Amino acid sequence: MQAPVLMVVGTASSVGKSTLVTALCRLAYRRGLRVAPFKAQNMSNNAAVTADGKEIARSTAVQAAAAGIAPTVAMNPILIKPEGQRRSQIIVEGRPWQSLTATDFWQRKAQLWSVVTRNLDHLRATYDLVIAEGAGSPVELNLKPGDIVNMRVARYAQAQTILVGDIDRGGIFAQLLGTLMLLEPEERQLITGCIVNRFRGDPSLFADGVTILEERSGLPVLGVIPWLDDLGLPEEDAVALEQPPVAPAHGLIIAVIRLPTIANFDDFDPLAREPGVVVRYIDHPLELTGAAAVILPGVKHTLAARHWLHERGFDNALREFTGAIVGICGGYQLLGERISDPLAVEGSGGEAAGLGLLPIETIFTTAKQTTQTIACAQVPWAGNEPLQGYEIHMGQSYRRGEAPAFLRIIQRGNTPTSADDGCISSDGRVWGCYLHGIFANDTFRRGWLRRLGWQPPTTPVARADPFDRLADHVAAALGPAVLDRLMRR
C-alpha cells in the first residue's frame, strides 16, 4: 500500500512553501509518523550533499532533518543550478546531467517525468506520509504543458493539496482566488483548503477576510499564520539576500560579497546567529568600511565572478583591506593567482588572473567532488575538534611553493583519507578552503570570531530548537482538527 501524499503549492515563489513543509514534517514526526519531504524539481544554488555523495536542494535537506531522517536524492530528484549566461547545470538524481539553456531544458523536460514518478513512488513505499512541495505558482499558464513539479504531481499522487498565499506582499484575495480560478477543475478538486501566511498583527483582525475567501472559493481557510521573526533556518534563494533582516546598529561586522551566482550562502547563517555579530551582504567596495572581515562565498561561475569583482573595483579594495579575508569554495578559488577552465566546464572556458591573495592555482575539470567531509584545521585557534562539512566543486586548487594548507581532510563519505585542503597566508590573515559548513562548527567559528575581536556573551544565549519552534507556531495557527485531517493515513 502506497503512503498518502500531502502537497503544498503556493500562489508565487517565496510565499513560504518550503517553511510550511518543514513545519509539517516536524509535526508529523512528533506524531510518530515516518514522514519524508519531496520536491520534484528545485532551482537553487544552495545545495546539500547526501551521505552517498549526491546533490539535492538545501531546503529539502532541512525538511528531512525536521522529519528526523537523513536526506536522499529521492526527495529532490531534479535540481537546477543557475550558472549565468542563461544556462543552468541540471542535476538528476544527485549527479550532473547536462548544462542547458532554458529553451533546451524545456525541450528535454518531458523525459524527466519518469524520474519524478519513480522517486515519489519509492518514498511512498518507504514512509507513512510524503509531504510534497510545489515550485513557484501552479498556474503559470505558459509553463503548464511542461509541468513536472506542481499539479501534475498532485494529480499523479491524488494528493490532498494546500494552497498558500503571502499576505505580507499584499493582494491576498487576488493571489488565492485568482490561482483557484486558473486551476483546471480536476486540479481544483484536489485543493483541501487555503492558508494565509505571514500575517502581521492579530490574526483575528482578518476574520472578515477569512469569511470572504471561504464564501468566494467554497474552500476552508485552514489557518492564518502570523509572521515569525528569526526562524533560524536557511533561506532557499538568493532573493532573500536582497531583503536582509534588520541588523543591530553595532557589533562585529563581517562583510560577505554578494557575487553573481552566489551559492550555499547559508554557510554564514551560524555567524549571523552569534550575539554581537552582524553579517552584511555587500555589492560595492565602499561597503567594506568598518568590517572586521570579508568573505568571498561559493559561486556557480567562478570566472564570471572574477570579472565582476574587477569591474566593481574590488581588486584594489581587497588588497588594501587590513582585516581578515576568507574564501569558501569558489571564493577560495578567487583568492588565488590563476583560474583556468581549459575544458569550458563553466561554459565559455578561458582563464583569468585571480586576486593574488593566496599562492594557489585552480584548474577546472569535468570531475565533480560531492562528499560529506570531516577535516582538521591546521591552526591553533580552531581547537582540536574535527570539522564536519561537505564539498561541492569541480575545480582543483594547487598550492605553490611551501604555502601551508588550511585543513587536513581525514574522511570523505565513509572512507578515511588524508589530504590537504585550502591555504592560509603566512600571517594567518587570509585563508580559504573547499569545506562548506565550516562555520557551523562551534569551536572553530568562535575561535575565528575571537581572533577578530569578538567577545562572547558572559551568559550563554539559550536557543529553542528551530524546528520545534516553527512547528509550534504553525500548529497554533492551524489547530489540532486541521492537523488531524491533513495527516490522516
Swiss-Prot record:
Residues 251-444 form the GATase cobBQ-type domain. SUPFAM superfamilies: Class I glutamine amidotransferase-like, P-loop containing nucleoside triphosphate hydrolases. It comes from the Bacteria. Keywords: Cobalamin biosynthesis, Glutamine amidotransferase. Pathway: Cofactor biosynthesis; adenosylcobalamin biosynthesis. GO terms for molecular function: ABC-type vitamin B12 transporter activity; catalytic activity. The active site is at residues 329, 436. Pfam families: CbiA, GATase_3. One of its GO terms (biological process) is cobalamin biosynthetic process. InterPro entries: Class_I_gatase-like, CobQ/CobB/MinD/ParA_Nub-bd_dom, CobQ_GATase1, CobQ_N, CobQ_synth, GATase_3, P-loop_NTPase. Gene3D superfamilies: 3.40.50.880, P-loop containing nucleotide triphosphate hydrolases. Catalyzes amidations at positions B, D, E, and G on adenosylcobyrinic A,C-diamide. NH(2) groups are provided by glutamine, and one molecule of ATP is hydrogenolyzed for each amidation. Belongs to the CobB/CobQ family. CobQ subfamily. HAMAP family: CobQ (MF_00028). This is Cobyric acid synthase. It comes from Chloroflexus aurantiacus (strain ATCC 29366 / DSM 635 / J-10-fl). The gene is cobQ.
